[in-house]
């Protein structure tokens, strides 16, 4: 138990030393370009500082939703034969959502 406490304390001290060292040794140029976020090639300096592309947001949302649905597929595939109906309902939901996004033109990449 004492060894575990010593390891945790050593890790916290080392983390604190690295944090303070980074703060002391870092470059202190506070220009407007330095402190603004880089948004995948978009210039975010102007009247609106929170500019972002809605297409990036939609693609991220699609990735999260379809990634979660793949995880649900894995759970359904290892269960019994009675879950075949729920598997096809989930598959129909995925294809329906994908078709709806294609129909509304949200899959067209515009910058």
Curated annotation (Swiss-Prot):
One of its GO terms (cellular component) is mitochondrial membrane. One of its GO terms (molecular function) is NADH dehydrogenase (ubiquinone) activity. It is found in: Mitochondrion membrane. It catalyses: a ubiquinone + NADH + 5 H(+)(in) = a ubiquinol + NAD(+) + 4 H(+)(out). InterPro entries: NADH_UbQ/plastoQ_OxRdtase_su3, NDAH_ubi_oxred_su3_sf. Its EC number is 7.1.1.2. Keywords: Electron transport, Membrane, Mitochondrion, NAD, Respiratory chain, Translocase, Transmembrane, Transmembrane helix, Transport, Ubiquinone. The chain crosses the membrane at residues 1-21, 56-76, 84-104. It holds the Pfam family Oxidored_q4. Core subunit of the mitochondrial membrane respiratory chain NADH dehydrogenase (Complex I) that is believed to belong to the minimal assembly required for catalysis. Complex I functions in the transfer of electrons from NADH to the respiratory chain. The immediate electron acceptor for the enzyme is believed to be ubiquinone. This is NADH-ubiquinone oxidoreductase chain 3. It comes from Ascaris suum (Pig roundworm). The lineage of its organism: Eukaryota, Metazoa, Ecdysozoa, Nematoda, Chromadorea.
